[in-house]
Amino acid sequence: MPLFDLKSPYPPAGDQPQAIEALTKSLKNNNHYQTLVGVTGSGKTYTMANIIAQTNKPALIMSHNKTLCAQLYSEFKAFFPHNRVEYFISHFDYYQPESYIPRRDLFIEKDSSINDDLERLRLSATTSLLGYDDVIVIASVSANYGLGNPEEYLKVMEKIKVGEKRAYKSFLLKLVEMGYSRNEVVFDRGSFRATGECVDIFPAYNDAEFIRIEFFGDEIERIAVFDALERNEIKRLDSVMLYAASQFAVGSERLNLAVKSIEDELALRLKFFKEQDKMLEYNRLKQRTEYDLEMISATGVCKGIENYARHFTGKAPNETPFCLFDYLGIFEREFLVIVDESHVSLPQFGGMYAGDMSRKSVLVEYGFRLPSALDNRPLKFDEFIHKNCQFLFVSATPNKLELELSQKNVAEQIIRPTGLLDPKFEVRDSDKQVQDLFDEIKSVVARGERVLITTLTKKMAEELCKYYAEWGLKVRYMHSEIDAIERNHIIRSLRLKEFDVLIGINLLREGLDLPEVSLVAIMDADKEGFLRSETSLIQTMGRAARNANGKVLLYAKKTTQSMQKAFEITSYRRAKQEEFNKIHNITPKTVTRALEEELKLRDDEIKIAKALKKDKMPKSEREKIIKELDKKMRERAKNLDFEEAMRLRDEIAQLRTL
């Protein structure tokens, strides 16, 4: 029986049918690696969706940055509206890992800010993987980082049935063991409240509904689901499966074993420091670890508990840590891993382990952490690439590694379903690039189309943005410090024509699906380096390939070897596409793609939550936030997004009571 229900108004076209057939056949023949070489705009995402539907396996789709993850999530939600499409990226808005600089005797404490909505989506992904097979997870490099043992997670989850006998007090203790906190005042995700014989539980993986369990003595009398906003009953259930509030939740037995294991390791390490006559490190480690042990014994958690992950998961020293792959492969289930934009993603995955290990080794050496902290790490590249699953690498410009691993299992996708050609390109003198580009932008904007500009430095991007804004252009600048939510919003705003020109550095290359963009400008194209390599140039030029008027301007004083190779590949592909169009009498037409609903990662709520935590908020600041939210609330209501409008209304009311 098919797991996935793929919805699309169009059948595969162009090179898609042969690519889908070839790669599906390769996967069904149990080949470990395969590669899709697909030009920009050829519908690689749709090909991926068809392959998932035909291979009938849960899938993990990995990308190297959060912007692409958000875009893929949106597209796959549209392709598979009746299946479980999940989102798994880092849950930190801000993260400063703990570190020690010996030469300055400076210890830097871990400092982080967790995004509540991203945490909810991560929990939703792991719970879906443990409960269902029709799951597609869109993930960043976070998929390679350590998680709790999925089998322990299964032990902690609880099935609750109407009519079953349960001691009321032991049920509350079970909720605490599962990571839920009792809170009678602020009832939100990951908490529960108990009034009389009624227990309300707000699952950590769902922000829309909470569960009410009603007892009669020591018997469960009723289970109901309530709307979290309106507080009205939605439905009654005969039973419900309740998952833990944390991916690191463990049972009391495992917790006790972990405490004993940490104590044993501490004793060995203290003995080592004593023998080496390193009393400073001895006392430092003893004090820090014993405090952590007290906290774990009393509450089940401590600050930096991830550093003791090996003790909680039961892994041996240096053994591969549990991660998202283990949730996909639970019950020896077969699954598919698709690495999107593999030419960038794979090198990024390969560099994760070394940096993490370098920092933690210093912490261990100087007594800030036990050696087991080294096992709280991302996967090594060899561990990742040899996972017991099948891989599909997807890129317009795959590296040698992907092609060597895939051998003959490589499919090309050069012909676009729309008949669109690779863009025309032109090299212009960089001496007058700013003024020349300004004139080009005016003609593009007059046609109602958009422009992407890529620069080499942040300073140039800022100055260019300022210059063009002063000259009357609607322009925005996207830089690396902008978070995932805001990046997604900026791209959406560009498509909605809230502005016409987007300037960036290395943010405009892979995977940005912007059919409204007809002009891509590459400043200082002849400056050899990573940002102007053959691969980077081809990827950047491809941003103009979704529009029938697509054009690329490269500003340079000379034609470099990288530029020449990029021109040759682009010209080869364009010639092949033109020939196909001529044979089949196809006229290129710009892609028309509806604006899917963006990720509802409520940045407004996060901002207000932080503001509400402050003891004193100036009246002027409060009024400013209220005004901002009122505007957004009206916009949401106008767009018929009444649920979000009501959320904003409630936040405004809360602010006005301060």
From Swiss-Prot:
GO terms for cellular component: cytoplasm; excinuclease repair complex. Forms a heterotetramer with UvrA during the search for lesions. Interacts with UvrC in an incision complex. It comes from Helicobacter pylori (strain J99 / ATCC 700824) (Campylobacter pylori J99). GO terms for molecular function: ATP binding; ATP hydrolysis activity; DNA binding; excinuclease ABC activity. The beta-hairpin motif is involved in DNA binding. This is UvrABC system protein B. GO terms for biological process: nucleotide-excision repair; SOS response. The keyword Transmembrane helix does not apply. It is found in: Cytoplasm. ATP binds at G38, V39, T40, G41, S42, G43, K44, T45. Belongs to the UvrB family. Residues 433-607 form the Helicase C-terminal domain.
